[in-house]
């Protein structure tokens, strides 16, 4: 079968990266907005206690979903590289192997999350008044992990093939259903936190079904065929060698953030609820920037498979510039319009004041994460995931835990807790850039001279 996927190895890079990223950016923003609808509906119609219950689970939700997102990034790199190399049979094997692996991981996370929810929430020091709602929300949410795994798989495969529009369409449909169900379950059925969790998993299974149906009907090289559903050992090793470190990186970030959440929980309920409301900004900014990171790894991987060395490094620098610029603009907007943003989630003045503390500090921090995450994506696009993951673990995870037990323990102010983000991102970004320089040199030695050149502007 001839490949009908979008070619990322020819043409003006700036224009291509923009056109590739915009639908993915819209997809990520919609996903954040739909997730925010959970918090907004709970905060407005079920009260601050239910809002605090949902907010208390945010780190654990990030732990589970982060691992699945990491799985998807590994799938994306492997599939994109084979597409760039025009190895269609390898693409088929990688796609079908990845679907089975993703589903297995999703089921495992669902089971572990459901069983250990009370213990994990207790470890976080969740307030007793919030515990019942938090347990109910998280256990129901965990039932959607297999669907989330499948959607992330499909999103990764379609992005690797250069198609970032279909996931946007699917998520839009599922997201509208999610909002309607949120309102129904919370306002009509009075299910509070459990209601928004139930709405979330229903929409997740809808989006998973849509992406599988699309791949089944695809006429491209990434078409799903029931007869080919098997685990091919070599492809499984390739996918897992990238996916597990990426998933662990995201999960370990969440684990480090457990200590941060425990620090937040050491303050009163107003600060906990304000932090929960303001933390929605993190997801919004990160997920917009994540579209650029996906573009970076997809373009670098396809061009690495095609042997286009100039396009590889240019893809990195263009992606870095875009992600840094996006971070600056969004940070400024959040600082200026922070009160209006927080009013979506709470109408309690004290909670909004607590949330503004986080927004002001994080608004000065997001740009540093662009240097770190874009460089991690570049390393992954070149097929290297283990060492960048170790760097992240040490620079942004272990360092954060040390900060909590030293700097924060000494000052015990919420400002001293939030400042660890900017410091850890700066340290990790510097180390990741040093790593990329070495990885790039090593990987370029394996390629023939670039005979096609590159046009770096539209």
Regions found by a protein language model. Name each.
Residues 8-45, 59-74, 78, 103-110, ...:
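N-terminal transmembrane alpha-helices
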Residues 72, 141-159, 167-175, 196-209, ...:
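Short runs within selected transmembrane alpha-helices of multi-pass transporters and secretion channels
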Residues 1-21, 79-146, 188-244, 300-365, ...:
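Short alpha-helical transmembrane segments in multi-pass integral membrane proteins
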Residues 42-62, 128-133, 193-194, 198, ...:
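Interfacial/gating helices of multi-pass transporter permease domains
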């Amino acid at each position: 079968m001839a490949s009908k996927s979008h070619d990322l190895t020819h043409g003006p890079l700036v224009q291509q990266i923009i056109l590739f990223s915009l639908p993915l950016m819209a997809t990520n923003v919609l996903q954040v907005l739909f997730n925010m609808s959970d918090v907004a509906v709970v905060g407005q119609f079920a009260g601050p206690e239910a809002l605090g219950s949902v907010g208390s689970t945010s780190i654990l939700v990030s732990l589970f979903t982060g691992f699945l997102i990491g799985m998807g990034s590994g799938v994306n790199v492997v599939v994109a590289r084979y597409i760039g190399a025009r190895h269609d049979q390898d693409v088929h094997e990688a796609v079908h192997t990845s679907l089975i692996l993703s589903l297995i991981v999703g089921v495992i996370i669902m089971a572990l999350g459901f069983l250990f929810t009370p213990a994990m929430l207790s470890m976080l020091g969740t307030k007793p008044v919030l515990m019942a709602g938090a347990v109910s929300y998280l256990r129901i949410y965990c039932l959607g992990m297999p669907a989330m795994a499948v959607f992330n798989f499909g999103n990764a495969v379609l992005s690797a093939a250069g198609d970032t529009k279909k996931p946007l369409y699917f998520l839009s449909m599922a997201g509208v259903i999610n909002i309607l169900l949120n309102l129904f379950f919370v306002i009509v059925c009075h299910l509070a936190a459990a209601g928004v969790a139930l709405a979330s998993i229903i929409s997740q299974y809808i989006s998973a079904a849509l992406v599988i149906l699309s791949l089944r009907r695809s006429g491209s090289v990434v078409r799903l065929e029931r007869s080919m559903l098997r685990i091919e050992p070599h492809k499984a090793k390739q996918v897992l060698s990238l996916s597990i470190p990426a998933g662990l990186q995201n999960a370990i970030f969440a684990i480090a953030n457990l200590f941060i959440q425990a620090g937040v929980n050491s303050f009163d309920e107003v600060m906990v609820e304000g932090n929960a409301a303001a933390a929605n900004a993190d997801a919004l900014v990160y997920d917009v920037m994540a579209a650029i990171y996906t573009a970076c790894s997809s373009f670098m991987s396809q061009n690495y498979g095609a042997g286009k060395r100039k396009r590889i490094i240019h893809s990195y620098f263009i992606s870095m510039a875009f992600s840094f610029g996006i971070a600056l603009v969004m940070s400024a907007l959040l600082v200026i319009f922070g009160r209006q943003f927080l009013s979506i989630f709470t109408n309690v003045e004290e909670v909004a004041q607590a949330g503004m503390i986080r927004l002001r500090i994080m608004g000065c921090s997001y740009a540093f994460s662009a240097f770190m995450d874009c460089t991690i994506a570049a390393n992954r696009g070149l097929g290297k995931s283990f060492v960048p993951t170790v760097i992240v673990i040490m620079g942004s995870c272990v360092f954060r835990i040390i900060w909590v037990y030293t700097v924060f323990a000494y000052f015990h102010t919420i400002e001293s807790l939030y400042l660890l983000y900017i410091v850890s991102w700066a340290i990790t970004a510097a180390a990741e850039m040093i790593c990329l320089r070495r990885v790039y040199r090593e990987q370029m030695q394996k390629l023939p001279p670039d005979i096609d050149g590159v046009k770096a502007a539209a």
